[in-house]
């Protein structure tokens, strides 16, 4: 929703999958849920699922919610394996012609796991696109080549993004991206849908910082198509 509004609003079949949508045992309260004012994480996950359904309904979509636990809910237990993700996903979505996954441009363990799984699929011949994941990717704003701003010699967003892509050789050229600029009408509709996440939005928005509510942020969406022919272990410089 935050990252793929243009895609969600496009025609054609599209399966939206929330990979880590499992509900933890009652009586637990994690850090993020505490920040967002929850009193019980199991209750909060159900509230988030309801909000997600409402938001997706605005573009005529629904979601498949897999039972895997979010990183905060499974700690201190282990992360699921790629086999665990594959089994949960194929049981609910048995076939696909293309996969869209987060680029992992921030310290989000779950996004990195899904990206890893998507990279494996790319190596097996399934077309894969990675998307810049808000709000993590805009800690330093958008790169000038995304939003058309003047280059700033003291703000190199490319350098920030590259630190999270060192193990993604399939994404060879950072600026070889598809950038979507939503017009005012679509940007306003996206913001309205994001606000549907009532329990999450104000914290994700950074309060008065207004990170996500800033049209200069939420109107842009960035994607990369992975090159599955890239040698997986080579060392190279991204330009």
Model-derived features: positions:
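The feature marks non-catalytic terminal segments
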Residues: 50-66, 75-80, 94, 124-239
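Active-site beta-strand->loop->alpha-helix modules in alpha/beta enzyme cores, enriched
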Residues: 1-124, 188
